[in-house]
Design a protein with these regions (language model features):
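Glycine-centered hinge/linker elements that transmit conformational signals in sensory
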Residues: 63-68, 98-100, 104-149
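Acidic, glycine-anchored loop motifs typical of Ca2+
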Residues: 73-83
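Beta->alpha turn/N-cap motifs
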Residues: 91, 169-174
Length: 197
């Protein structure tokens, strides 16, 4: 059993569920960031694995790499879902993952095992403000909440069509949806909040 998950989910010495290596869906639903290696190289983005390994893969680093990557593919002079972006995201569960990748928590246990809600904190507010700015104030970043109709496959479709340098998703997407992709892609973790994390 996953020790950290069992510890995190136990309340009053009772764990209502557990996860092990046998839970393939838990592994498949591990969130990550995919990147198109050819597009990344075309935009001068190299050494991503080194950036990650050196602890420099932060939300600000993602922003600096992607904020100016935009091509108006449909030539309508409007930024919309038909264009190429540096980073594309779906608007639902893939956004929740930032809380954990930034080092945040919903609940915390004290030394006695008592649980308290810590989600509503200045740190969480900082996370939300940063993500709102990240997704809505940068030409090179697109989130499908701007689309007239929601599709959970939007980012994957853009990525497989080579219209996004980066997308966030889950490891299982590589097996289910990215096999048909002609370009090579890489898998890296969600960004950290800052290098000190």
């Amino acid at each position: 059993w996953s020790e950290s998950t069992t510890d995190d989910l136990s309340v009053n010495d009772v764990c209502p569920l557990a996860i092990s290596d046998f839970a393939l869906s838990a592994l498949a639903n591990t969130y990550c960031v995919f990147y198109n290696k050819r597009l990344a190289e075309n935009y001068g983005i190299t050494d991503l694995y080194d950036i990650v390994n050196e602890g420099k893969w932060t939300i600000d680093k993602v922003l600096s790499l992607t904020k100016d990557i935009y091509t108006d593919l449909d030539a309508d002079n409007t930024a919309n879902g038909a264009d190429l972006y540096g980073f594309i995201s779906t608007a639902r569960s893939s956004l929740n993952t930032y809380l954990w990748s930034f080092g945040g928590h919903v609940l915390e246990k004290d030394a006695n095992g008592d649980v308290s809600l810590v989600y509503h904190s200045p740190k969480t507010n900082d996370f939300i403000e940063k993500l709102c700015s990240f997704y809505f104030d940068n030409q090179g970043i697109y989130i499908n909440s701007k689309e007239p109709e929601y599709s959970s496959f939007f980012a994957l479709e853009k990525f497989t069509n080579n219209e996004a340098v980066f997308i966030n998703g889950a490891i299982g997407n590589s097996v289910e949806y990215l096999r048909s992709m002609e370009d090579d892609y890489g898998i890296i973790p969600y960004p950290k909040w800052d290098e000190a994390q």
